[in-house]
Amino acid sequence: MKRIAFVFSTAPHGTAAGREGLDALLATSALTDDLAVFFIADGVFQLLSGQKPDAVLARDYIATFKLLGLYDIEQCWVCAASLRERGLDPQTPFVVEATPLEADALRRELANYDVILRF
């Protein structure tokens, strides 16, 4: 079976990309256990709790990220440089337990996957 990586690189609620990526991730987890999730660039904002999507008339899907553990999705990484660039602390309690990696280490980890889906 191919190893599949899901890369979240867009901010939540501005487009449907994050919600669609999460839906695809959960659906794919029913078919394979060999997948991982990466949060880079503005995608790191997907990890923040306390968002108020109703203020922009968007659906609150961020809480659904908390289900990753129930779906046995345990390989989650976040780009440490992206966090710093956006003024976020790696010690922030995110909705998903994601391991911070520097950009080079994150690229090396991502290279281990056969299929990369970016949202």
Swiss-Prot record:
SUPFAM superfamilies membership: DsrEFH-like
Domain of life per record: Bacteria
Keywords from the named record: Cytoplasm, tRNA processing
Subcellular location: Cytoplasm
HAMAP family attached to this UniProt entry: Thiourid_synth_C
Protein family according to the UniProt entry: Belongs to the DsrF/TusC family.
Name under which the protein is recorded: Protein TusC
Entry keyword annotation includes tRNA processing: yes
Provenance organism: Shigella boydii serotype 18 (strain CDC 3083-94 / BS512)
GO BP terms in the entry: tRNA processing
Listed GO CC annotations: cytoplasm
Principal location listed in the UniProt entry: cytoplasm
Keyword Cytoplasm tagged: yes
